[in-house]
UniProtKB/Swiss-Prot annotation:
Organism per entry: Caenorhabditis elegans
Cited InterPro entries: Alpha_tubulin, Tub_FtsZ_C, Tubulin, Tubulin/FtsZ-like_C, Tubulin/FtsZ_2-layer-sand-dom, Tubulin/FtsZ_GTPase_sf, Tubulin_C, Tubulin_CS
Family of this protein: Belongs to the tubulin family.
Binding site for GTP: Q15, E74, S143, G147, T148, T182, N209, N231
PANTHER family, sorted: TUBULIN
Gene3D superfamilies cross-referenced by the UniProt entry: Helix hairpin bin, Tubulin/FtsZ, C-terminal domain, Tubulin/FtsZ, GTPase domain
Protein name: Tubulin alpha-8 chain
Binding site residues for Mg(2+): E74
Function: Tubulin is the major constituent of microtubules, a cylinder consisting of laterally associated linear protofilaments composed of alpha- and beta-tubulin heterodimers. Microtubules grow by the addition of GTP-tubulin dimers to the microtubule end, where a stabilizing cap forms. Below the cap, tubulin dimers are in GDP-bound state, owing to GTPase activity of alpha-tubulin.
Major site of localization recorded for this protein: cytoplasm
Amino acid sequence: MPSDGRECVSIHIGQAGAQIGNACWELYCIEHGLDEAGFLKEEEKNKKQQSLQAFFSESMNGKHVPRAIYVDLEPTVLDEIRNGVYGNLFHPDQIINGKEDAANNYARGHYTIGKELIDVVLDRIRKQTENCEGLQGFLVFHSFGGGTGSGFSSLLMERLSVEFGKKSKLEFSVYPAPQVSTSVVEPYNSILTTHTTLELSDCSFMVDNEAIYDLCRQKLHVERPSYSNLNRLIAQVVSSITASLRFDGALNVDLNEFQTNLVPYPRIHFPLATYAPVISADRAHHEPLSVQDITHMCFEKANQMVKCDPSAGKYMAVCLLYRGDVVPKDVNAAISSVKAKRGINFVDWCPTGFKVGINYQAPITVEGGDLAKVHRAVCMLSNTTAIAEAWARLDHKFDLMYSKRAFVHWFVGEGMEEGEFMEARDDLAALEKDYAEVSRDTADLEEENDEF
């Protein structure tokens, strides 16, 4: 089957990356009619197969293998994949683990333990890319807070930039939640990894566990959400973002278009993701949702994947990715009604700011999952200055610990220089300033320039 040369290689790093990866590949297989081993199901064989090639390579015997690499510095999570339902989907070479973990320590992931694994990982990634006709880029899944997710990811991004200079690198990052913390040193790891990858990543979609946890509890009525509930919801967002590479649509968006439309300045590349409708299976029949309904839902704080307040910031760009039973006329009407609403503010140098994608493939859900099957859904990616609030929160936590030099010896003991902490923190202070700068009105800036 000829490829149209829009392949993407997914790289899943650490526990968060691997477990989100599981949820994504489970969903992709269902969307494309593949069984657990990657073969087309009988009823799918006569249908026209849409561009599976972007995410799967096909072997001689008709097996579809994900273009993906899983990496963790210790084996537990990856062993679960090897022995799990989709264990046969991947070639053993695609799943790579070390012997000891990064112990929540950026320096272990980036310097000591990570160094031992990086060449093997790059070699396997190279093999994946040699199998592509026209590689579009890489999707990197990881968390900011873990040692592997932060340290190894930034090491890998550095090496990918050297080896595949011009290829897009998009990140899906789990940002530390405001209230729920998985480790004390999350603020250190997050700020160190953000500093290292800030100049290397083209676009970084952030999700935070607390926001998704609340979505599962409040909208899906799951009393005690587990990581698998959270990850299935994240997978729907990832699927919406990548659907245009995998299916036909009226207005398709490829990887480079995301950057062009969402990233006004290279450093300001952290769009906020919102997905609608998030409704549970038992409520779906009572709520037929129009294009206008789901579009308005995207602008509600409760549907966001990161805790921040968009009404306190300004939008620089908005990308609306619809899928299912949606026609452009309805979308235009919905956008007009959104623009008329108060409390949705755009920066004055980018007054229009809406990019739309429509994909005819209806949203598909996992059997026995929490989400209802619906006829249409939308994923909104918005670059808003409000996300600066998330950085400010993190910087504050960093400052509290660093003022006492708490836990710093663990990092320095793994070969890091203490100077790196301040260098990273200064870079994030500059990032906060960048956000403040773009949200100021052009008129104010012109007045200041006149004074000089």
